[in-house]
Amino acid sequence: MAFMGIVARRSPPPGILAMTDTLHASHAAGSAISAHAHTDAASRDAALARRYGAEAVPPAGPWNATIAGLLDHRSVRGYRTNDTLPAGTLETLVAAAQSAATSSNLQTWSVVAVDDRAVRADLAKLANGQAHIEHCPLFLVFVADLSRNRRIGERGGATLAGLDYLETYLVAAIDAALAAQNAVIAAESLGLSTVYIGALRNDPARVAALLGLPPGAMGVFGLCVGRAADGAAGEVKPRLPQPAVLFRDRYAAGGEAELVAAYDPRMEAFSRRNEMSAARWTTRVIARLADAAALSGRDRLAAILRGLGFPLR
């Protein structure tokens, strides 16, 4: 109908309007998803290139923030001075650690948070003078601990002869490692940095004495946790190409020499950029494992463990 020269226009039915709005919203959402997927792909490719080198990036696969955080891991040996962590950080990390898998739910590990500065200084000294043990705001010693289960047996009138075997010690060491790695992942998700201290195994008996560990308990490694000092984080360290460690159905070392030869210069370049020893990775492997002396006292570990209450039958 026309009135005064103006043509009256009919409005679209409500259903058509709703459909149009839905299509516009779907298009916008699709564009956002596409952009997000593109960003994720770029993030994934960059992270894999940092970890393996651009020449050895494995095939693309699923990706999320958790995987991105894992690939961004690096050991940090410099921490902010006089720093403190938020209240509850220790307990949160231990909750994450206790959420790791544990063989048969035996829970054969414990952890000691070391605050005593004199004890930290002694631990740093036996660990080849690693000063970050003294300076980090949180230092943990993860313990392969069969003593708790031994006490459970004693209270129940059982001797638990199964605790005396190498297998059970191995379970405890693995439990401690799994727990610690969960703690590391949790710490890094909170923006904290970490470094493991395997050099505590230079003198496990001294570590046990310093921490008051009972027989059947051994400090397998330490862990520094804190906020990285400026410039301390460094780069992500390259790893061996996946075909050097990933096999399908059967172990196959046929192409290993070529893969390791390709990795050596990548690791050498990383070391030069980060002001480390420029020796090739293979050279370091040979030096680190050349003889008993290269183990810094750890060649006596079996005897020391027996002295700490692990018969290792």
PLM region spans:
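Acidic, surface-exposed loops and disordered segments
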Residues: 2-313
